[in-house]
Amino acid sequence: MRTISRTIKVELLNFSELSPEEQELVETAARVRMCAQSPYYHWWVGAAIRCELGEVYDGCNTENVNGSETVHAEEGAFIMAVKEERKQGRHAKIQAMAIAGGPEGTEIEIVREAKTSPTIKINELCFACGHCLQVIWENSMVDPNVVLLLLTTWGEVARTTIGDAYPMPFGPENLGVDIRQSLK
């Protein structure tokens, strides 16, 4: 028997420790989160994507009584990115994404300077659901270094990569497809 293991790296940061580009994504995700429509789960989520050339696109979750018709915030942002990037003749390759989620109607105060965070476990940080991690993976052009930022409900920012958040993905490469070539 052989054992294969992997370490998952997540950094907990104050807003001031982020780059200006990361700060913009986190602020955008937090702002658009307040537009969510979540009458059933009462959990509002906002997402912001930065594509390869620096454009930022956002989205929020919109629920319907038929759960399969619900649009996740990450999907909404990506749909906007695809539409706008395709107008320019480009594919929407995700460079970084920020996600902010929390109870309906509550604003999350962004911690801008040093503050002691609560003791947390790694599985308490939900960067995205499995469905959205798959969407992010495929639209990162299978680049494991795409940055994911999570505005926690206590105001700190957690930073990881899609490779760490989704360590065993199934994607185009498993089917022998070079996603960059097939989208030209």
Regions from the PLM with identified roles:
Residues 1-38, 85-184:
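C-terminal binding/interaction regions
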Residues 40-42:
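Short solvent-exposed loop/turn micro-motifs enriched in small/polar/acidic residues
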Residues 44, 57, 128:
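Short glycine/serine/threonine-biased micro-segments
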Residues 44-51:
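Short beta-strand scaffold segments in enzyme catalytic cores
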Residues 50, 63, 134:
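Short, electropositive, low-hydrophobicity segments enriched in small/polar residues
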Residues 51-55, 152-154:
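Short acidic-glycine loop/turn motifs at beta-strand connectors
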Residues 55-101:
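Helix-adjacent hinge/juxtasegments
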